[in-house]
C-alpha cells in the first residue's frame, strides 16, 4: 500500500497517550498531534493517522506479486514498477500565459529573448532560467545517491541511473543504459535464470535479457534509503535491493561523502541450494559530449584494510575541467566471491560480458588496465558478487558506488574549489578505493543513525502516513539541489569585511561553505527569498550549515558590484548589487558564485521589500533554535544595516512599508502596490524581532526606536488591510487588492517559530490570525479543486482563483507547507494537515513528480520549475508540532513534568 498506516496503528486520537520522546534524534521528536479531527467529523476516518480511502494503493494497484521484501519499512513512497501515471502534464511555457498577462509582459519577453540569444548563441552559456527549454516531464525519479555537496546521481524508481549532477550545479537528465544490475541464478552447476533488472528494451546491449516483468516488483523510498523488491517468477527467489546514502543530521563528515551503498538481500524460498550472482555494470561517463574526446580508461582495484576486503573497478574520467574517478565495488568475504570485467563496449550487443556471466555466474577478472578510449568510443565495466544460497536461506551481497571529484571549477573556470570530503580523505583524486571501503564498512552505522533519527516520527501513530513520507522524502533536495559544500581557504576571507564578525572564520573554516540551487531549472545558489521557506530543514538538521550560509549572506550584504546591467522586467539599467542590502542569490554555478552574486536579473532586487526582512527574521530564528549568542552578536550590525535600508520604503512614516507597484518580492510575477498583507506582515514581524534582539544586545535606543515603529505599524496594518475576514492582498484600488492570499500570515508564521507572536509579544491579533487562516482554508483550499490540491496562491472573495497574474492562480508547494505549519501553530491542526496533504498527493501520487517536487502547479495542465528548494518548508510543520508538544508539556503540573525527559529552552533570555 502507498503511504499507508499499518492496520495495527489505526486507532483514534482519543485513545492515544500524550507523550514526547526527547532524546537526541537529529532534529525530530515524536509528537502527539492534538485537535486532529474536523469539527464536522466524529469518526476516526478523518484523523491524520488513519489509513483512509486515498491510501488505497493506486500506485501499487498493478502489483501482482506476494513478496513484501526483506525488512522494508511500512512508511514511505511505494510504487509498483509496472505503474503508469495517467496524468501527463507539461512544463509552463509562454503559451500558457493569458492574453492580458502576455500584453503586460510583452516588453519583458522581448528583452528576455534578446538576452537569451546572446547568452546561448554568442557566449555559448546556459541561461540561469531557460524559458524555451524547460526540463520535460519524466515520471521516473527516485532517491538520489550521494551525500551533501559532493555531487549526486539519481536512480529512478524502475532502477535506471537517470539524473546526474557531478559537475557542480549543472544537471544532465540522461538514462545510461549500460548502468544496470543483473541477477544470475544457478542450480547444480547450470545457469537457470539470468535477467537484467530493468523494464527497458533498448537498442544497444541487445544480447542481454531485458524487459523485466514490472508487475512482480515494487520500489519503496524513505530518503535517504530506498528499497526495490523483485519477486522472480518461477524461481522461488525474492531480491531486496536496499540503497543507502549517508544523509545524517548533525554529522558534518560522513554526510559529505560522494558515495552510495546497495545491499542485496537474496531470499531462497525453495528447497534447492542456489548459486546467486549480482552483477553491477557501469559506463565510464554518460555517453554524451563529455566522453566524446576519449582518453577514458578502467582498472581493477583491491583494498584490504582492518579485516575488510573490497574489490572492484576504477573508471577514470580525466575530462577537464572537473576530472573524476568512479569506483564500482563489492565486499569480498568468506562467503562472497567478487569478480569483474574491466572493459566492454556499452554501445555493442554486450554479448561477451553476458556470456561470461552466463557461463559460470562469475566474470573473468583480467589483469591490468583497459586501453584508453579513442575519440567517440565508449567503455564500461562490471563487478559481480556471488554466493551460495541454502534452501530457505538468505544471503547478502554488498556493493558501493563512489566518485572522487575533489577539485572543482564552476563555469567561469576562475577558481579551484575543494569539496568538503577532501578534508577527511584528501584532494589528490586517488581516494575512490578508500571511499568505497569506508562506505562498505560504515553503512550499518549510518543505518542505525538514520533509524534513530527517523523512528520517533515513523512510530508516532498520531501522524498521517503521507506526512511521514513527505517529511523525509522531500529532504532529497538538500543533497540533490545542485548542492556544493566547499572548503574555505584562510586567504579567501577578507579581513576588512569579516573582522567585526568574530565567529565568521571559525564557522566557515570548520564547517565549510554551503550552497544549493533555487531549483534544478532555476540555477541560482542560495536564493534567499526562497531559502526563507526551505531553511527550516537546514537549521533543524544541519544548523552549522545554516549559520555558514548566513555568514556568507552577511559578507555579501556589505559588498557592492556597481557593474550596470539592464533588468529584464522593467528595462531599467542599474547596478548588479548595492551595499547594505541582502543579495537575491549568491551566484550561478555556470559563472563564479560567491565572487559574482545576483545571477537573477529579472528585477533589480535592491528594491525588493522582502529580502532584508527575511534575513532579520532568519537570524533571530536561527539564534532561537541554536542558542548561539556569538552568532546573534555578529549578525546584529548586519540587521541594523539592512533594516536601515528598508526604512526608505515607509514613505508616509506610518510605521508600515509600501510596495512599489511592481512584483517586488518573492512573488516576482504578482504586482503589489502600497501596504500589503505579505510584505507588511514580514515588516512588522522583523520590527518585532529587532525589538527582541535590541533587548538581548543591550541597545536601549534601538529598542525604543523599533518599539515606536511597531506600535504605529500595527495600527496602520490593521486599519489599511484587515477587512473582518482576512488581510487584503494590498491596499491599492486594483481588482486583485481584495484577493485572499494564502501566504498572508508569513510574518506570524516566523514569529511563532521564534517563540513570539502571542501574549506580551503579540503583533497580529490572534483572533484576526485565526480568522484569516480559516478563511484561507475555506476559500484557497476547500473551494479550489475540491480541496484536494493544497492552497491556491490567490483566491477572490467569491471563490474564483485570482488570475490577475501568472502566479496568483498557481499552487506553490513550499508556501502550502509553510501555511500548514502556521495553521498548526494557531491550533488548526486538522486544517493544516488537510491543506498539506493535497500537495503531497498531487505531486507524489497523481502527477508522478516524486523527487522533483516543483515550485508550482496549476489546477490543470501545467507545472513550473521542477525540483525546487521551497518545499523543504515541510520541516516547519515538524517544528510546529514539536513546539506544540513542548507547550502542552510545559503547561502540566510540575510533578507530571518531572516524569518526562526535560526539554532545553530555546534561546537564552539574558542580554549578551
Swiss-Prot record:
> Membrane topology type, per the record?
Peripheral membrane protein
> What EC identifiers does the entry list?
3.2.1.45, 2.4.1.-, 3.2.1.-, 3.2.1.46
Keyword Transmembrane helix tagged: no
- Residue ranges that the Swiss-Prot or TrEMBL entry lists as coiled coil: none
Which biological process annotations from GO are given for this protein? Answer: bile acid metabolic process; carbohydrate metabolic process; central nervous system development; central nervous system neuron development; cholesterol metabolic process; glucosylceramide catabolic process; glycoside catabolic process; lipid glycosylation
Does Ribosomal protein appear among the keywords? no
- Quickly give the catalysed reaction: a beta-D-glucosyl-(1<->1')-N-acylsphing-4-enine + H2O = an N-acylsphing-4-enine + D-glucose; a beta-D-galactosyl-(1<->1')-N-acylsphing-4-enine + H2O = an N-acylsphing-4-enine + D-galactose; beta-D-glucosyl-(1->3)-O-lithocholate + H2O = lithocholate + D-glucose; beta-D-glucosyl-(1->3)-O-chenodeoxycholate + H2O = chenodeoxycholate + D-glucose
Name used for this protein in its record: Non-lysosomal glucosylceramidase
Q: Which gene encodes it?
A: Gba2
Amino acid at each position: 500500500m502507498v503511504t499507508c498506516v499499518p492496520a495495527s496503528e489505526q486507532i483514534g486520537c482519543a485513545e492515544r497517550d500524550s507523550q514526547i520522546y526527547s532524546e537526541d534524534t537529529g532534529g525530530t521528536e515524536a509528537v502527539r498531534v492534538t485537535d486532529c479531527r474536523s469539527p464536522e467529523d466524529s469518526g476516526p476516518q478523518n484523523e491524520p493517522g488513519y489509513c483512509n480511502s486515498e491510501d488505497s494503493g493506486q500506485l501499487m494497484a498493478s502489483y501482482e506479486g506476494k513478496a513484501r521484501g526483506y525488512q522494508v519499512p511500512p512508511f514511505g513512497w511505494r510504487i509498483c514498477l509496472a505503474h503508469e501515471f495517467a496524468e501527463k502534464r507539461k512544463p509552463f511555457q509562454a503559451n500558457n500565459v493569458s492574453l492580458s498577462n502576455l500584453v503586460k509582459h510583452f516588453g519583458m519577453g522581448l528583452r528576455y529573448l534578446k538576452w537569451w540569444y546572446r547568452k546561448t548563441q554568442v557566449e555559448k552559456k546556459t541561461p540561469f532560467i531557460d524559458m524555451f527549454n524547460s526540463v520535460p516531464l519524466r515520471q521516473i525519479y527516485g532517491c538520489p545517491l550521494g551525500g551533501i555537496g559532493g555531487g549526486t546521481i539519481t536512480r529512478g524508481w524502475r532502477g535506471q541511473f537517470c539524473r546526474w549532477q557531478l559537475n557542480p550545479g549543472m544537471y544532465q537528465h540522461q538514462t545510461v543504459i549500460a548502468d544496470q544490475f543483473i541477477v544470475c541464478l544457478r542450480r547444480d552447476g547450470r545457469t537457470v535464470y539470468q535477467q537484467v533488472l530493468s523494464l527497458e528494451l533498448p537498442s544497444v546491449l541487445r544480447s542481454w535479457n531485458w524487459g523485466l516483468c514490472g508487475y512482480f516488483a515494487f520500489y519503496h523510498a524513505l530518503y535517504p534509503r530506498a528499497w526495490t523488491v523483485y519477486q522472480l517468477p518461477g524461481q522461488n527467489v525474492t531480491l531486496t535491493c536496499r540503497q543507502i546514502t549517508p544523509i545524517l543530521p548533525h554529522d558534518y563528515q560522513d554526510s559529505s561523502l560522494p558515495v552510495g551503498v546497495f545491499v542485496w538481500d537474496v531470499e531462497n524460498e525453495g528447497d534447492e541450494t542456489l548459486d546467486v550472482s549480482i552483477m553491477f555494470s557501469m559506463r565510464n561517463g554518460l555517453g554524451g559530449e563529455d566522453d566524446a574526446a576519449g582518453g577514458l580508461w578502467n582498472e581493477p582495484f583491491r583494498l584490504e584494510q582492518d579485516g575488510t576486503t573490497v574489490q572492484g573497478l576504477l573508471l577514470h574520467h580525466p575530462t577537464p575541467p572537473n576530472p573524476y574517478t568512479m569506483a564500482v565495488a563489492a565486499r569480498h568475504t568468506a562467503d562472497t566471491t567478487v569478480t569483474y570485467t574491466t572493459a566492454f563496449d556499452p554501445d555493442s550487443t554486450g554479448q561477451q560480458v553476458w556470456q561470461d556471466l552466463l557461463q559460470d555466474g562469475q566474470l573473468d577478472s583480467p589483469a591490468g588496465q583497459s586501453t584508453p578510449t579513442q575519440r567517440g568510443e565508449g567503455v564500461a565495466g562490471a563487478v559481480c558478487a556471488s554466493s551460495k544460497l541454502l534452501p530457505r536461506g538468505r544471503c547478502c551481497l554488498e556493493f558501493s558506488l563512489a566518485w572522487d571529484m575533489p577539485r572543482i571549477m564552476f563555469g567561469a573556470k576562475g577558481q579551484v574549489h575543494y569539496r568538503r570530503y577532501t578534508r577527511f580523505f584528501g584532494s589528490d583524486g586517488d581516494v575512490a578505493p578508500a571511499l568505497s571501503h569506508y562506505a562498505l564498512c560504515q553503512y550499518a552505522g549510518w543505518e542505525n543513525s538514520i533509524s534513530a533519527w527517523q523512528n520517533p516520527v515513523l512510530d508516532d501513530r498520531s501522524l498521517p502516513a503521507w506526512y511521514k513520507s513527505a517529511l523525509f522524502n522531500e529532504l532529497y533536495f538538500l543533497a540533490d539541489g545542485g548542492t556544493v559544500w566547499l572548503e574555505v581557504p584562510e586567504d579567501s576571507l577578507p579581513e576588512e569585511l569579516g573582522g567585526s564578525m568574530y565567529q565568521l572564520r571559525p564557522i566557515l573554516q570548520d564547517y565549510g561553505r554551503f550552497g544549493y540551487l533555487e531549483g534544478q531549472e532555476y540555477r541560482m545558489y542560495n536564493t534567499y527569498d526562497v531559502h526563507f521557506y526551505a531553511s527550516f530543514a537546514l537549521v533543524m538538521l544541519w544548523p552549522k550549515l545554516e549559520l555558514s550560509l548566513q555568514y556568507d549572506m552577511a559578507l555579501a550584504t556589505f559588498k557592492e558590484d556597481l557593474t550596470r546591467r539592464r533588468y529584464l522586467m522593467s528595462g531599467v539599467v542599474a547596478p548588479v548589487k548595492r551595499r547594505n542590502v541582502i543579495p537575491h542569490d549568491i551566484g550561478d554555478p555556470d559563472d563564479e558564485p560567491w565572487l559574482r552574486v545576483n545571477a537573477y536579473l529579472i528585477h533589480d532586487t535592491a528594491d525588493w521589500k522582502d529580502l532584508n526582512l527575511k534575513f532579520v527574521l532568519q537570524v533571530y530564528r536561527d539564534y532561537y533554535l541554536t542558542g548561539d549568542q556569538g552568532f546573534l552578536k555578529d549578525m546584529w550590525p548586519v540587521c541594523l544595516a539592512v533594516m536601515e535600508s528598508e526604512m526608505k520604503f515607509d514613505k508616509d512614516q506610518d510605521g508600515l512599508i509600501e510596495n512599489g507597484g511592481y512584483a517586488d518580492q518573492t512573488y516576482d510575477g504578482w504586482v503589489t502596490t502600497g501596504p500589503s498583507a505579505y510584505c507588511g506582515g514580514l515588516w512588522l514581524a522583523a520590527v518585532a524581532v529587532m525589538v527582541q534582539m535590541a533587548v538581548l544586545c543591550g541597545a536601549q535606543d534601538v529598542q525604543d526606536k523599533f518599539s515606536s515603529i511597531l506600535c504605529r505599524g500595527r495600527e496602520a496594518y490593521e486599519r489599511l488591510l484587515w477587512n473582518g475576514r482576512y488581510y487584503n492582498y494590498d491596499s491599492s484600488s486594483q481588482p486583485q487588492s481584495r484577493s485572499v492570499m494564502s501566504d498572508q500570515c508569513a510574518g506570524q508564521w516566523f514569529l511563532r517559530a521564534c517563540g513570539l507572536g502571542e501574549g506580551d509579544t503579540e503583533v497580529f491579533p490572534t483572533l484576526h490570525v485565526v480568522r484569516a487562516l480559516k478563511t484561507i482554508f475555506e476559500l484557497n483550499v476547500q473551494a479550489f479543486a475540491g480541496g484536494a490540491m493544497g492552497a491556491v496562491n490567490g483566491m477572490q472573495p467569491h471563490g474564483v482563483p485570482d488570475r490577475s497574474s501568472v502566479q496568483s492562480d498557481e499552487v506553490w508547494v513550499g508556501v502550502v507547507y509553510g501555511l500548514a505549519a502556521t495553521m498548526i501553530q494557531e491550533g488548526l491542526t486538522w486544517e493544516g494537515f488537510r491543506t498539506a496533504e493535497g500537495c503531497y498527493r498531487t505531486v507524489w501520487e497523481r502527477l508522478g513528480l516524486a523527487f522533483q517536487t516543483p515550485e508550482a502547479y496549476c489546477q490543470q495542465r501545467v507545472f513550473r520549475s521542477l525540483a525546487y528548494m521551497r518545499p523543504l518548508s515541510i520541516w516547519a510543520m515538524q517544528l510546529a508540532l514539536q513546539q506544540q508538544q513542548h507547550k502542552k508539556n510545559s503547561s502540566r503540573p510540575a510533578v507530571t513534568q518531572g516524569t518526562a525527559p526535560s526539554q532545553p529552552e530555546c534561546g537564552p533570555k539574558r542580554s549578551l
